[in-house]
Curated annotation (Swiss-Prot):
It comes from Pseudomonas fluorescens (strain Pf0-1). The keyword Transport does not apply. This is Indole-3-glycerol phosphate synthase. Signal peptide: none annotated. HAMAP family: IGPS_B. The lineage of its organism: Bacteria, Pseudomonadati, Pseudomonadota, Gammaproteobacteria, Pseudomonadales. Pathway: Amino-acid biosynthesis; L-tryptophan biosynthesis; L-tryptophan from chorismate: step 4/5. One of its GO terms (biological process) is L-tryptophan biosynthetic process. Keywords: Amino-acid biosynthesis, Aromatic amino acid biosynthesis, Decarboxylase, Lyase, Tryptophan biosynthesis. It catalyses: 1-(2-carboxyphenylamino)-1-deoxy-D-ribulose 5-phosphate + H(+) = (1S,2R)-1-C-(indol-3-yl)glycerol 3-phosphate + CO2 + H2O.
Amino acid sequence: MSVPTVLENILARKFQEVAERSARVSLSELESLAKAADAPRGFAQALLAQAKKKQPAVIAEIKKASPSKGVIRENFVPADIAKSYEKGGATCLSVLTDIDYFQGADAYLQQARVACSLPVIRKDFMIDPYQIVEARALGADCVLLIVSALDDVKMAELASVAKDVGLDVLVEVHDGDELERALKTLDTPLVGVNNRNLHTFDVSLETTLDLLPRIPRDRLVITESGILNRADVELMEISDVYAFLVGEAFMRAENPGIELQRLFFPERGVPVSGSTLD
């Protein structure tokens, strides 16, 4: 019997979590909360507008920890990080809400969104319509659908629920087979290519470059994971990739927003700042 991969372990726990949550708060209660939530801010629209100008469309991630690296950021105040990212030029935010493997929380998404005007994606392992409605109830503007975690029927169902509640969808792929499934099943304009293999957690930027020719021009390619320096950014930009999801490089910096500006907008110069987020 093979040893379960990281992703398989996460998904097994996620099924338990959904059962526990739905026992506490019913789907109909969540649907009422979703209807009462602030209007969506237009996640896809913001990214498409920025990338169309051939400017970096950065989804800046708020992430305390990961299964592969452990705790990434000790000084973790989501509201302050969100403000810092907005000041640094982020187009959107990504907030981890997975508790067991990423030390995330629903409250982190709410705190980050209230602190800024940027659209926010709920970064989690979505496997059930309950989580999609829950995301909108929390105030999310977009949800992540990971192809390696879903079959085609479930993927289509979750995307349909997202549309019904007013959420954009970012579909995430890692290889050619997943890309083919995503393009066949979903019409979302946002296609994220994760350079990290979710089974082994190994990272290679070649993943994005290899899949790029197979992605239709009417979809926006978002390169995810492994962007650590200017050379990585320039490698993508010369290949006409202008949308990025970056977390760890920012989370390890003293001021995440200044690091964002240094990495993506060096022509603006780096502002003088104290040791705290401001």
